[in-house]
Amino acid sequence: MAEPRVFLKENRGRIEENYLEQAKNLPRVFAPVDEKLQKCTEEVALACKYLYAFMPYSDIGNYPFEVFLDYAENGVRLWKENPQVADLPEEIFLNYVLFHRVNEEEIAQCRTYFRAEIGSRIQGMNFREAALEVNYWCAEEATYHCTDDRTLSAISVYRRGNGRCGEESVFTVNALRSVGVPARQVYAPKWSHCDDNHAWVEIWCDGKWYFLGACEPEEILNKGWFTNASSRAMMIHSRVFDTKIPEGEVIGTDGMVTMLNELKRYAVTKEITVTVKDTQGLPAEGAEVSFEVLNYSEYAPIAEKKTDSKGTARLTTGFGSLHISARMCSDGEWFYAETVMNTEKEDNCELCLVSQDKRNDGESEKWTAADIFAPHDAPVNTDMPTLEQKAKGNKRLAAANVHREQKVRNWSNPECERFLGKKVNRIEEAIAASYREDLLGVLTEKDRTDCISDVLEEHLELAIPYHGMMKKDTFVSYVLNPRVDDEVLQKYRREIKKHFSRAEKQELRDDPSRIWNLIEKAIVSRPEKERSSVITTPAGCIRTCTGSFLSKKILFVAIARTLGVAARLNPHDRSMEYMKNGRFVPVLARTEKNCTLILKAGETVQWKYFQNWSIAKLENGRYTSLKLGAENFEDQILNLPLESGNYRILTSNRLPNGNMFANEYHFEIQPGETKEIELVLREADLEDMLENISMPEFMLKTEDGTEVKASDLTADGKHILMFLEEEKEPTEHILNEMMEQEEAFAGYAEQIIFVVRSKEALETPTLSKALAKLKNIQIYYDDFSEIINTLGRRMYVDPDKLPLIIVTNGTLNGIYATSGYNVGTGDMLLRLM
């Protein structure tokens, strides 16, 4: 007779040990947790202890025990009832079934609910089959929607029916884990071929990891719209919160989180070596090396390593360009070095550290060019569904879309309605009632979909006494407003108020900078126990007496607002500010904006921040980009108030083939100084823009419904494929450009292919006029349901923007593509032909 299984037998000891360490560090918080654990079964208590042992301090401070109990109880039930789950290696179960956190999302109870919704649909299925089925359920409940950077909880994505890719994948991972399928989120932190990033999901079955697109179901695993894009990535990573690290290449840590390199599953890779030397030319052991890609016109880190005793660091990456920087602190002084490396041609590079303070010596204040190359398209995951599977999947996806659209059609957050609809009985409440819509109005669209009425009530009730002490817009934005940054919206004002006597409150109002002094004394930062992007709420900081530097800055603003002092984090650099004599002043003297940079735009370029330029400040051996908002050039001039220090301006020209022409300008600005710099964007030649991308075969139809292969249409020489959306402005623009250059385009008319949805499109005014002028253009038909998306993704342009225009040179060989309307597209097409 077999011995009964023991829950977490192999890891029980280390779980208990790590839990006790957490409890020892935060005794006040863990005392009530211990009491509640005593009421749980042995297995559930151990599961809870695992969560508490390896969660960030921010989770401990932000959420009550009952939230984590849902995850623990569901995990234990799966282990007891599902033999597949019980047979999992313990580390897989702990990290990828039981654990509550996926990335940096808000945590809310969801697992038990999701299991109840999904469980009956996957009865009798193995993990592979269940993963595919769960993803169809996810598509029925949520789809992509561009939103702000705060990451919703999985249950909020489910309720509102949409989220950005990072939220869709958080939702899908939670859905998979809820029914026992081991799952994790993986990220291309930044693409190399375009300005964006992407997150998707991996599931573990048959002893290995497979991928799928979150809320984007397919009939097979290892297929998604991003399959080709991921082959051009320089890094794809996963993360683990446990201290017992799985096998794999560690590419950095974010506090308590370890990042793992997953690129080999998606792309052709190689190992590169970076050697760092100190100012004496000797190996710099312990230097921090940052590997970065140029994205949104800033160098964004994708991996970080420390050098060994020989001063070397190694990384497995793709075949493209990396910006590599190194930093090191010695005797309180920071040293820095940087270079650009094309890994397609180079295996090694060397960096020589120099003092950060001597980085800009005056002679270096000039524009320096850098050529940034994106990896070539080289897919390693080539599995495709059969025609039968594809047809089945299309039918199921269409049904999922109908279900979801019906669900969200008239959805709104009932908590907002409850908050707005509260009955008013007294004069004081009547005053507060007038600010209810103002409070909701100052929140983001995302906030309004997951805010809680009781939370808003406390903020309104305790802020309203200060409403007459300042201008209304100042009061609403910087006192009443419950949001400071991207923290979870929770109550905190009553908790803060009870910590101070009446006299102390007045002293802090008289000199708000003293609030920071109190925070520095009372709140300890433990970065090794946190994840930098997961914020401890103001109330959580007070409960645990811990918080990251950002969390403490948010606490400063929260205390100030609670006391009726208008305060904020500066939107450019997140420095703390409070209002004094009608203007915001810095809390810390070192963040005072005591210099002015005058940027000149020139005549020909439309400058857009984080699109073709950015500016970053060098501090502690690391450049950090300023978060400029809607600042616009007036009369070709932009005035930027800055702190004194060393800066780097980047300009970048992204080419259609994914490569970039970059320009760098390093400078130092002194207190009181005004400096003028003219922005310069590098221009590209035609040959720099072209690609050679093999497009998949697809079919178009003639007027009588006969199917024609695209390979036949593109067989001889160059062609222009134009998928048109008649009577829509972007399509009208390109048609007008073509008619304005009628003579030039007429010479290529037989090589131009217009694709429309119906014959009626040809009768619309602008399109019919264009066809009359350019008589030999070929006309074909498609319903735009699938081909548009496939070709747009394949050519690395936005498939949701029409017209989609592709220039081919030879059979199904795409050399150029654009989507939507861009000024000068007509001229570009003529140059290409």
Task: List the model feature ranges, each with a label.
Residues 3-160, 390, 395-544, 554:
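Secondary-structure boundary elements
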Residues 799-820:
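A short, hydrophobic beta-strand/beta-hairpin element that forms part of a small beta-sheet core
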Residues 768-802:
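Short, internal strand/loop/helix patches
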Residues 710-734, 751-754:
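Short active-site neighborhood of thiol/selenol oxidoreductases, capturing the structured segment around
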Residues 270-281, 595-605:
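A short, amphipathic beta-strand motif
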Residues 295-317, 620-638:
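Short, acidic Ser/Thr/Gly-rich low-complexity loop/linker segments typical of extracellular
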Residues 2, 116, 120-136, 145-156, ...:
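Hydrophobic/aromatic-rich core segments of domains that either
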Residues 312-325, 329-331, 340-343, 632-657, ...:
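Short Pro-Gly-centered beta-turn/loop motif in secreted/extracellular proteins
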